[in-house]
Amino acid sequence: MKIGLVSPYDWSYPGGVRDHVLHLANEFIAMGHDVRIMAPASGPKGKVIEKPVLKMGWTTPIPINGSIARIMLNPSLALRVRRVLQREHFDVIHVHEPLVPGLSQAVLRCSRTVTVGTFHTTSYPGIYSTSNLAYASAYPFLRPLFRRLNGCIAVSVTARQFVSRYFPGDYRVIPNGVNLEHFSPQVTPLPQFMDGKRNVLFVGRFEKRKGAKYLLRAIPAIREKFPQTRFLFVGEGRLRRGFQKFVERQGWQDVIFAGYVPDKDLPRYFASAHVFCSPATGGESMGVVLLEAMASGAPVVASNISGYATVVNQSADGLLTTPRNSEELAWAVKYLLEHEPLRQQFIHAGLQKAREYAWPHVAQRVMDYYCELLEEQDTSSLRHRSQAL
């Protein structure tokens, strides 16, 4: 089968949708399928512009859902997409975030084969979130595009609930996956962090909705009980400099901002963590980073938001705390550090949970859905031909 995977976001920058598309491509190729990825790409960061990626053009950064999305806005985009589709002759085109402006919408307009859309987004808290306004205000324009989809996937029940409020339909829930060969308890920790201190890890962009400031505010309460605790913050973002200045003003030691960490090195940070903490305030359709922590053997403390609650079972394989509540967050981290049997229980349960989300299983579910849609199309075509006769 020849499959075209489409990402509307800049392939040069790391992100959840990009990783999802890349893992699907790798799994499909391993199955023996022919795969191309259509995506914009604007910069040299990382090893990204290589086969099977078809670079569609440059991007423009715009704020979406409490984050920054780099998407392609180009008047010649439709012509470029049409040429690629005519050349490649895909059996299935799978568009991720199909209603995002730019490449996704252009592919929907031009596609003449079975077209699948995966919806990753949920709303950021508040009626006036960007994603809410975009869907509500652009509904008359987006509805005809949505109807061009032969099949719809949502990465979680949360994502399905959000998009179906505006675009009702039959959604297949197929989650994000986790790479168990990459994230594993067998990974060697970073030696500089294996000095007897406890390590609390945060991984994510420094944006408002990721909630890093709530972990920073929890540091004094955690250190009151466990003074020899190190805090590792992995990621980049516009708020990072302000957070670093805050730490400097407090005079805190062992609060480390590691910056951008390449994907190949990230598992060693997870392997070094005694507790993984993700205090996001919303806008998360599913907790992929939580699965990466679980697969690495790091017990999880996270915010009790709908996207995270689809991954973590409270008190069974992690602790969920009230969003924006640094006191409760500090209590949960201290409780895990203080109760080693519970920490080990969460490690064991998390490893089991991660196995349920292994990419080969997830990719096979997507492939099975493709086959269902292709069979439906063949049946429909035969019916139309028989009626014509």
Residue ranges of model-derived segments:
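Carbohydrate-associated surface elements
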Residues: T158, G177
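Acidic donor-binding loop of glycosyltransferase active sites
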Residues: A271-S285, A298
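N-terminal strand-loop element at the rim of the active site
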Residues: S7-P14, L22, N26-L73, V84
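Conserved acidic donor-binding segment of nucleotide-sugar-dependent glycosyltransferases
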Residues: Q314-S315, L319-S326, Y335-P341
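Membrane-proximal helix-turn-helix segments that form the acceptor-binding/catalytic region
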Residues: R109, S123, Y135-C152, R165-Y166
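Short alpha-helical donor nucleotide-sugar binding micro-motif in glycosyltransferases
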Residues: Y260-V261, R268-A273
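Nucleotide-activated donor-binding/catalytic signature segment of Leloir-type glycosyltransferases, i.e.
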Residues: R241-V261
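Conserved donor-binding/catalytic core segment of Leloir-type glycosyltransferases
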Residues: I153, Q192-I219
